[in-house]
UniProtKB/Swiss-Prot annotation:
Gene: TTC6
Protein name, as recorded: Tetratricopeptide repeat protein 6
TPR repeats: 57-90, 101-138, 139-172, 176-209, 210-243, 245-280, 281-314, 320-347, 348-381, 382-415, 416-449, 450-483, 484-517
InterPro entries: TPR-like_helical_dom_sf (IPR011990), TPR_rpt (IPR019734), Ycf3 (IPR050498)
UniProt keywords, alphabetically: Repeat, TPR repeat
Record has Zinc-finger as a keyword: no
Length: 520
């Protein structure tokens, strides 16, 4: 096939060099040959010499396309507008409609080529909308309009157009790009479930695209579907065994499993990435957190330090080392590292982390200032509200604490720690119905968490429902058998019920456990 193409190409070049051969051709044929041979100036000269009439607008469209190839975008815009004006005054018919749609499409491309950003894209949208009104099955017009909407940040309009493209008889390449582009918009909007479906469809079209598998895996990770994330990261690695981001992504997904075997499997992935590229910072930082999770704080500190030495501007490495320093009891070093991170990038997360360090150092006033600054910087950052609420609780400002816990839940509705703290606070404030609902929600999501049963027992105790309190304390002890606090409180509850012997036995058990703990 290529031999025939090369022969045809050679023949066209030969004709272009023969005046006699060209003179026997029509002006349109001559222009096409000159344009094919990339002699755009000559092609434009031929077409400029033609006196057009309304029935020959194809000439006008051809001239504009040649000018576009010659990078004469402004001239192309003028010609296209001239053609559209002529068509608007001619008898309408299928040919005129097709030429008009083609002119409008190319006019949109010209606007995009000119690069006048907002105005360019808005003008392109106007012209593409006109093209769509003339041919509602033009998937290319819808697709290009979606691209323009994306450029001017009209993301919902872009999503609508991409949806229409997929309903039309688009080519496979356009469908692939549509799924990709729409998926990226969903990621930007934080709608990872929708993005996931688009990336999956794209992966079905392009099965050997490792980046698509990686994007799909990342969406699974974002919506806490960690096993599915591992599967897609593995697929990406089968396509490309040296895909570093896939090793790190799979390792981070394994870390979310929450058991030792998965943590060790994650370590293998991080080490594999570092074996391929020892200077790969993402893998180094993730490996540091992996070692921290295993309680190997000094080794974790070493790897965060290597990351900092490799890239002194990497604020995530400073943050990781600050966390490890805090766990090792070196509060001053932790403060130095988090301040170093904030000099590079001040985020709500870093401010909140610094607030935690202030709390460890006993500086609650400074901690509260950092939490408030974090909220100012990012009013949707749940953890800052939660930590500030805990300080209010500590100072017995329970109404403020409850308000801050509610704000934290607004932005992180499934956080069981915030729910339980609000339940405890509402119990103190005697908002019993709200407290009851919060405790029920926590137990539904965390049925094997001993602490929630212990705290709900306090709630029942306040309501003088001692039998229900005893049931919850029994459940707490079944989950955490040697807790002196629970035995001590159950003794108090049983005393209220009148179970004196059982209460005395619980008091004695609590004392024995406390004595044992003091000896250890």
């Amino acid at each position: 096939m290529m031999k025939y193409y090369d022969l045809a190409k050679f023949t066209i070049y030969q004709i272009a060099e023969m005046d006699k051969g060209l003179s026997e051709l029509s002006p349109m044929q001559q222009a096409l040959i000159y344009s094919f041979c990339e002699n755009h100036d000559k092609a434009i000269e031929v077409l400029d010499g033609i006196s057009w009439n309304r029935a020959e607008m194809t000439m006008c469209a051809l001239l504009a396309k040649v000018q576009m190839k010659a990078k004469r975008t402004k001239e192309a815009v003028e010609v296209l507008k001239k053609a559209l004006d002529a068509i608007s005054h001619s008898d309408k018919g299928p040919d005129a409609t097709a030429i008009s749609a083609d002119c409008l499409y190319n006019l949109g491309l010209c606007y995009m080529e000119e690069g006048n950003l907002q105005m360019t894209y808005k003008l392109a949208i106007t012209d593409l909308t006109t093209a769509i009104s003339m041919d509602k099955n033009s998937y290319t017009a819808f697709y290009n309009r979606a691209l323009c909407y994306t450029k001017i940040r009209e993301l919902q309009m872009a999503l609508t157009d991409y949806g229409i493209v997929l309903l039309l008889d688009a080519t496979e390449t356009v469908k692939l790009n549509t799924f990709l582009n729409r998926g990226l918009i969903y990621v930007e909007l934080g709608q990872y479930g929708f993005a996931l479906e688009d990336f999956k469809q794209a992966a079905l079209i392009s099965r050997t695209n490792g980046s698509l598998c990686h994007a799909t895996a990342m969406c699974h990770h974002r919506i806490n579907e960690f096993e599915e994330a591992v599967n897609f990261f593995t697929w990406a690695l089968k396509i490309n065994p040296c895909f570093l981001d896939a090793y790190v992504g799979r390792g981070n997904s394994y870390m979310e499993y929450g058991h030792d075997e998965a943590t060790k499997q994650a370590q293998k992935d991080f080490l594999k990435a570092l074996h391929i590229n020892p200077a790969y910072i993402k893998a180094r930082i993730s490996f540091g957190y992996n070692l921290q999770a295993q309680g190997k704080f000094q080794k974790a500190w070493n790897h965060f330090t290597i990351a900092i030495d490799t890239d002194p501007k990497n604020y995530l490495a400073y943050e990781g080392r600050a966390v490890v320093c805090l766990q090792m009891g070196n509060n001053f070093a932790a403060m130095q590292d988090i301040n170093a991170a904030m000099k590079i990038s001040t985020t709500a997360e870093f401010l909140t982390n610094r607030g935690v360090i202030h709390e460890f150092m006993g500086h609650k006033q400074n901690a509260m200032k950092d939490y408030q600054d974090a909220i100012t910087l990012n009013p949707k950052y749940s953890l800052a509200y939660f930590n500030a609420g805990n300080i209010y609780f500590h100072h017995r400002q329970f109404s403020q604490a409850s308000d801050y816990f509610s704000k934290a839940l607004k932005f992180d509705p499934e956080n069981e720690y915030v729910l339980m703290n609000r339940a405890i606070t509402n119990t103190i404030l005697k908002k019993y119905e709200e407290a009851k609902e919060d405790f029920a929600n926590v137990i539904e999501s965390c049925p094997f968490w001993a602490a929630v049963y212990f705290n709900r027992a306090h709630f029942y105790y306040c309501l003088k429902q001692y039998e229900l309190a005893e049931e919850d304390l029994n459940k707490a002890l079944s989950l955490k058998p040697n807790d002196a606090l629970v035995y001590n409180f159950r003794a108090k509850v049983r005393g209220k019920i009148g179970l004196i012997e059982e209460a005395m036995a619980d008091y004695n058990q609590a004392l024995d456990l406390e004595d044992y703990a003091s000896v250890i």
